[in-house]
Every structure is written in structure tokens, then in C-alpha cells.
Amino acid sequence: DELISNLLMYGKTAEHSVLATLAELEDARKRGMPLRAAERKRAYRAVRELLELATEYGFNDNLWQNYLSFLLMMDENPFTLTAEKVGAGEGSVNRFVERDFHIFRALFRYDFGALERALGTDCFSVLTDYRALPKPAVRCYRAVSEKVRALSLSLAAAESDEAFFRTMSEFYRAYGVGKFGLNAAFRLEDDEKKGVLLKPIRNMDAVKFSDLIGYESQKEELRKNTEAFLRGQRANNVLLYGDSGTGKSTSIKAVVNEYYKDGLRMIEIYKYQFRWLSEVLAEIKNRNYRFIIYMDDLSFEENESE
């Protein structure tokens, strides 16, 4: 309806299929058009899509507010990209953002009662007070789920547009935006239509350095080198070698887990994917994070041809 059509900085959000469908149905209702079986089917299709998203990312309680929070977390626009890992600065762009957040606050409190009566369903009311079935952690993005639900509660509690703005600015400062903000590690995937994609690694083991017994001097060297890298100081490339089971992969995971909050991200690349490295660097070069390129299974045999 007119709320969504007035989004400017977050205008791409209005194109998301669930939000767009609900806006069209609400607009039709307000113009006095009858909502029959075909419209009800469209509503159910939108609800199903939202439920699929909720299952993938572990939404719970108020799925509608979780969904809106997720859209805000994922929208890479001039404001959010500037604010990632530093927070919102002072500038005229903030006026556009504040207007958009005023709309999102209204969407957070949106009353679906009239639309439900017109459609003859209560599906939207169910979404706003939802109890998800217990599911294994591997079925959803655990780390993303926690962030979505925490942000959703904070935004729902915002008593003013200014408080809403501060909450989102703090989120972008703490985590960033989009897939790089919400995820710590990535792998490459070759898509015939879209080319090379950076895909988040789901639910990476939450190991810490304390889980590695021994290797104290090696762990300390990794820490010092990583911290220098994060500060923008000179740091070395690192070669981890040793027999299978000696903690090489665990050390990498521990580094990423420990320094994720400081903006460290890891991209896993295999030997046969080296030809895509320039494309990867082009995608990440203007983002406000520090990336480790993790190359596994390197070989230094005399007859190695690659």
C-alpha cells in the first residue's frame, strides 16, 4: 500500500515478494475490490514463503516483525554500506533513512485485521504469535537466527523514530549489513547463471582457542598476527602445517570465531578455484571488513603442475 511505496533508501525492500504481495492485497482492499479465492491463494503463497524463510533462519514468536528485521539487516544501500562497522554518521542521507524508519515502525505495528476479514482468514494473526517446532541446529542459520530475534525485540520496543534509528545504527556498527555482516565464513560456488557466488558456511563449529590443548606459542602467534591485521598494520601470510588431526582447521575456525565481532571474515578457496580469486577480491574490496583467504589442501610435491 502507500506505506511501502513511499520507501526511498530501503526501496528495494518493497520489491521482496512477501511484502509486495501483502501491499498489493491491502491496496486492493482499500480500493473496495472484492478479495476472493484467487487473492486468498496469493496471501497463502506469501505466508508459505515467509514460513520457509522462518524455517531457514530460525524465526520465532512474531514472524512478521522477525521478517521486517531480516529485511533491514540484509538491505545493502548507500546508508547501510556507509554505516557498516562504524555506525551512522552525520549527513543529509539520514533524513531519508529516518522517513523510511518511520514507515517500518508503522509496519511493525500493522493491524492485519481488516485484510484478514476481507480475505476470510486469520493467517496473519497466527504469524504474529507463532511457536516454531523444535528443529536441529543444522536446519537453520543459528547465528543469524539469534541476531534476527534480538534485533526484532529491540525494534519492537523502540518508542520513537529516533530510537528505531539508533537501534539500527548500532546494529550496523556492531555487525554490518547483508551476508558479510551476518556471517563469519564463506565458500565459493559456481553458478551457471549468476557466476561465482560467495555462499555463507552454515553453523561453523563454535570452537575457541581454549578448545585446543597445547600449542600455546602457536596460538599466541596467530593471535598477534591476526590482531595486527585487524588494526591495518603489517601482518604475515600464515602457513599451518602438520599431520591430520593436529588442529590446523580448528585453529582457523577459532581465529574466525574469536575475531568475528572485530570485523574478521574468512573465505575458503580450494586450489581449483584460484582462477576466481580476482572476482572474489572485486566483490569484497570496498566492504568494511578484514578478510582471510583460507586455502586448504595445498600441495608442494616436486611434480606438482598447478
Language-model-detected regions and their locations in the chain:
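AAA+ P-loop ATPase mechanoenzymes
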Residues: D1-I213, S217
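Long, positively charged binding patches that form subdomain-scale interaction surfaces
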Residues: S169-A174, S210-I213, E221, E227-A228, ...
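Pre-Walker A (pre-P-loop) alpha-helix and adjacent loop at the N terminus of AAA/AAA+ ATPase modules
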Residues: M204-L239
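Phosphate/oxyanion-binding active-site loops and adjacent basic polyanion-contact surfaces
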Residues: G214-Q218, K248, Q273
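Walker A/P-loop nucleotide-binding motif
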Residues: G232-I252
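Switch/connector loops and helix/strand junctions flanking conserved nucleotide-binding motifs
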Residues: K248, E302-N303
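AAA+/P-loop NTPase substrate/partner-engagement loops
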Residues: N257-F291, L298-E302
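Substrate-engagement module of ASCE P-loop NTPases
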Residues: E306
